[in-house]
Amino acid sequence: MLPHCFSNLTSLRDNENKMVLGPSFYTSTPKFQLEVISLSKCITSQQLSRKVPTFLYYQYDLRNVDLSHNNFSGTVPTWLLENNTKLGGLILKGNSFTGPLSFSSALISDVSSIDISENKLQGQIPTGICSTFPYLRRLFLSKNAFEGNIPLCLCGMKDLSFLDLSNNQLYGKVPEELITKGSLPILRLSNNNFSGNVVPMILSANGVRNLYLDGNNFSGEMTNVNVSTFEFPNSLWEIDLSNNKLHGKLPRWIGNASFLWRLDLSNNGFEGSIPMEFCKLNGLEFLDLSQNNLSGSIPSCFNPPYIEHVHIHGNRLRGPLSLAFYNSSSIVTLDLRGNNLTGSIPKWIYTLSSLSVLLLKDNHFHGKVPVELCKLHSLSIIDLSQNMFSGPIPSCLGNLSLPMQTKKILETGFYGTSIEEDETARSMTLNSVMDSYYPESYLEEVIEFTTKSGFFLYGGNILSYMTGIDLSCNNLTGHIPPELGNLSEIYSLNLSHNKLTGVIPSSFAKLHQIESLDLSYNNLSGEIPNQLVELNSLEVFSVAYNNLSGSIPEKAQFGTFIENSYEGNPFLCGTILHKSCSKIDSPSTISTVSEDKGEDGLIDTYDFCVSFLVSYVVLLLTIFVVLYINPYWRRAWFSLVGKCITTYRYSNVGNFLTYHIFKQCV
């Protein structure tokens, strides 16, 4: 609670320092006049009301107001704008304001930034917003429930430089004048119901720097442009058209976008090959063409000098990697999962010196896992699962440091200047209140990785810390290298569904950070090392379907694992398996007994085969004689045989499709 003695107070900032506002804070008339108030994330649930504190009714000199993320309810307090004629910035995002949005018809010329995003506002965006705030520079209305069309008056606001209407229920066509006005660097219309053709908007986007049209209903082809006469707008740095209904071939004219930094065309219906013109995108840092129907091979010339993140998963690309990405020392993420790529991992993979995330899952790569991977000191996530790799696991993989990599996060930067304070005027500048909130880019680097028996998406700071190796569902042979125990920073290790033999290395006890360890479906033998009880972070553990024997550890984390973690190992024993270790036969004893039984069974099998063959011949002769004598039975027999053949044929077709659609190893 604020003391009344603060009569000379002009600036109140208490961000994220939980304040408990007493009744007087809502009812009393303050003795101070503020110029800046910033109370983001600071009002606790112990207060008496969820309404905006009434002491603000008596403030008339406010320049900047930030009441974000406090769960205030009721209607939007537009009286803050009406009472404070010098107000420049208003941030009310992350609350629970409801109802339609309406503003006074009076001119308020000083307001340049308004953020009412992440609330529960409904209805249409008021057209009066343009006349009330003619010099508005930044408007954020995202994550509400606004519907209808974009007000045409926004097209005439010459000072508007940042417009975010994303995550609403807006529909119709995007006004072309909004794009062509030439002074709107950042336009975000993501996740609405806009429709129409996006090509004219891109062609005329002079002055637009970041264009986000993802998550809408834009449709049609993007190829109807004369490449020889077309000049790509030099201002466009970033385009996001993902999650729309675009189809046809990828536009060759994109190759003219020499200033383009980031391009996202994922989750559409593009088909055909990747145009050679994409090789001319020399400024490209981020490319996402995933989840389309692209085919053909990756152009060998595709090697942008500054490329950092490449996502082309979920297509039908084929062929070897050849020289694509060769010597791309800047590349951090290479995601080629879910294609039909063949061949081996090229020896030049070590030239990707900055590579941190390598995802080649679900392709047709073969050959050995190359030791050149061990030279990539920035590697922290490797997924080579569901391929046809063979041979031993390189022991040098244990030398990888798996470092934390902030480079895995897509750099966004911030719009405007950093927070500053004008101590002479004892107030924060407008940029200090508004600009520090909003990133320059809304594209986020997110990767999918299988761990803990499930698919997980990693992005942001979590991606920086995530480390893992997945070599499952291949044909790897030999022993598990004890050197893998040196991967002390690894969180997930999956070697399942291979043909590995030998014992589980006791050195795995040094995997102090590991949360998921899967060694199932191999030919491992011996006992589970008791030293593994030292793995205090282990959450998921499986050695199912091996040839392990002896008692299972039951201390620490191993007391939490269920029977499924050990199934398919008949010689394991322990409380979890409801099998006493004092009564179980050893593998060697049971093996000897089985061999003795096999010798006796050989004579029985011979006698059985002779008698079965004689009976079978007699049965066939009897059926032949009966069918020859009786024509009615003969027709019935042929009809039955025809039905059986038809059923067998369709049954085999169904099994074939099932086998190829649903892989055994997932």
Question: What is each PLM-predicted segment?
Answer:
Residues 581-666:
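Terminal membrane/secretory targeting segments in land-plant proteins
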